[in-house]
């Protein structure tokens, strides 16, 4: 997830989906904010472009094409537009497409940067020009360990020029490498531009980790090389085509423009934070920040899942499969607490173990999450009628959850059953008996299993 900033050529952070590291020595897991390859410094006639020396500032999100566009005028010298893409087709890569229209003859300098968080360990920052026969591939790269060494993260980046063959060294501008420090790795070029002649180029980067790759360093290089040597229109058109496909699942509201924008923004974020066939889920903040540690809560099953189930069943399947892929950890948790079946964590990460901080009673007592999972599973089958999925994933999950609730319930003297000592949907009311939401969702889960 690339989070833009309201400053020229700046982004706040890049969040790495499903990549976790401990937040502190005694803390729980937290989603990683990775190296930032999406910042540039651009100079015109020796002066750096900043928010203080531009006018006609405008930023907009094109939800249809998933493109974040910024435009402005730098003094009386140039009109500049750039567009940030978190590429849907190259899911580990981003692409910043830049257009400069000189209002007079000018000289530009563009510096692309890889900035490594200070908490990362032993960054190795390099610049190399790879070569295959006559094709040359300039690669700026940093490789480092995450905060406590759980993951190796590799980030690569390079410039792309649209009017030339970027793989030909004799055609592209001279590149200058500046390793400011182990944590700041820069690559620059300069170019003289003539009045009213558009100049177009891009900065593209990719970031990979050992969560997904044995060799994240080399994989990040491959993605960048692909972007370097693929014509821009082909690359961006494929990205747009995939977003066109996503928007086949739309909600149209007539006569209320603001409500239409609000609903589409919500859908945009659901689509941007998820992917069909990934078997990953969505945290409350998606990929916009490290809030909630990037963990998966009941928010997914109860609020995010229903619209996706109706509008994009490939993504909906990924969300439920995320849970079934972690059913063994849920079964272990049930055993550890003296129950049968599967008991899901209140906060889940890549492992499927409980990831809630120990001080939060929700992690120990908010058990309705297990029923919420069952409700989502049965609803997926009811809508899709996918019997193969029901046999391999759906019913095994419903049975394990039913077994859990049977073992979790306590028989009363009058023949009724109670579920005691829980945190319900109201997280500020801990250690209550027969919470309405918990009991109701458990009853629903048991009915769905029969």
Language model region names:
Residues 1-292:
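Acidic/polar, glycine-enriched structural segments that form the non-catalytic walls/loops
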Residues 81-82, 111-112, 317-322, 335-336, ...:
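Beta-strand segments within the central parallel beta-sheet cores of soluble alpha/beta enzyme folds
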Residues 95-99, 139-152, 188, 283, ...:
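Short, hydrophobic/aromatic alpha-helical segments in well-folded domains
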Residues 108, 211-218, 250-254, 310, ...:
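Inter-helical turn/loop segments and adjacent helix faces that build the functional surface
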Residues 115, 206-208, 309-310, 351, ...:
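Short, glycine-/Ser/Thr-/acidic-enriched flexible segments
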Residues 233-385:
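Substrate-binding groove/exosite segments of carbohydrate-active enzymes
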Residues 265-272, 322-329, 396-408, 444, ...:
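Alpha-helical scaffold segments in carbohydrate-active enzymes
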Residues 288-296, 342-392, 400-450:
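The feature captures the catalytic groove of carbohydrate-active enzymes
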């Amino acid at each position: 997830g690339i989070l833009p900033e309201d400053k020229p050529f700046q982004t706040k952070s890049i969040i790495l989906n499903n990549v976790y590291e401990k937040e502190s020595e005694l803390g729980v897991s937290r989603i990683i904010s990775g190296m930032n390859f999406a910042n540039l410094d651009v100079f015109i006639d020796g002066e750096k472009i900043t928010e203080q020396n531009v006018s006609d500032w405008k930023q907009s999100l094109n939800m249809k094409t998933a493109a974040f566009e910024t435009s402005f005028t730098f003094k009386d010298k140039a009109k500049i537009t750039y567009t940030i893409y978190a590429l849907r087709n190259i899911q580990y890569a981003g692409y910043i497409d830049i257009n400069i229209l000189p209002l007079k003859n000018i000289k530009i300098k563009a510096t692309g940067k890889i900035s490594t968080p200070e908490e990362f360990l032993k960054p190795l920052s390099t610049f190399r020009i790879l070569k295959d026969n006559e094709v040359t591939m300039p690669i700026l790269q940093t490789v480092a360990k995450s905060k406590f060494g759980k993951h190796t993260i590799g980030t690569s980046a390079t410039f792309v020029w649209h009017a030339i063959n970027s793989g030909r060294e004799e055609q592209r501008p001279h590149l200058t490498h500046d390793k400011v420090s182990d944590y700041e790795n820069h690559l620059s070029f300069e170019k003289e531009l003539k009045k009213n002649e558009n100049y177009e180029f891009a900065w593209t980067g990719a970031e990979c980790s050992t969560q997904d790759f044995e060799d994240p360093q080399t994989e990040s290089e491959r993605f960048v090389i692909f972007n370097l040597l693929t014509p821009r229109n082909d690359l961006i058109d494929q990205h747009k085509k995939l977003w066109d496909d996503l928007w086949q699942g739309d909600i149209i509201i007539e006569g209320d423009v603001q409500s239409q924008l609000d609903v589409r923004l919500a859908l945009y974020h659901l689509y941007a934070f998820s992917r069909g066939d990934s078997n990953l889920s969505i945290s409350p903040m998606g990929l916009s920040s490290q809030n909630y540690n990037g963990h998966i809560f009941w928010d997914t099953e109860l609020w995010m899942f229903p619209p996706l189930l109706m509008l994009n069943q490939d993504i909906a399947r990924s969300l439920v499969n995320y849970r079934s892929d972690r059913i063994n950890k849920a079964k272990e948790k049930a055993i550890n607490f003296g129950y049968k079946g599967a008991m899901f964590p209140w906060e889940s990460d890549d492992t499927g173990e409980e990831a809630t901080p120990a001080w939060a009673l929700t992690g120990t007592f908010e058990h309705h999450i297990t029923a919420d999972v069952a409700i989502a599973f049965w609803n997926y089958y009811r809508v899709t009628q996918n019997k193969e999925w029901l046999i391999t994933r759906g019913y095994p999950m419903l049975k394990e959850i039913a077994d859990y609730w049977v073992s979790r319930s306590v028989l009363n003297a009058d023949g009724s059953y109670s579920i005691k000592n829980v945190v319900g949907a109201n997280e500020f009311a801990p250690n209550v008996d027969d919470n309405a939401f918990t009991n109701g969702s458990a009853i629903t889960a048991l009915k769905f299993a029969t």
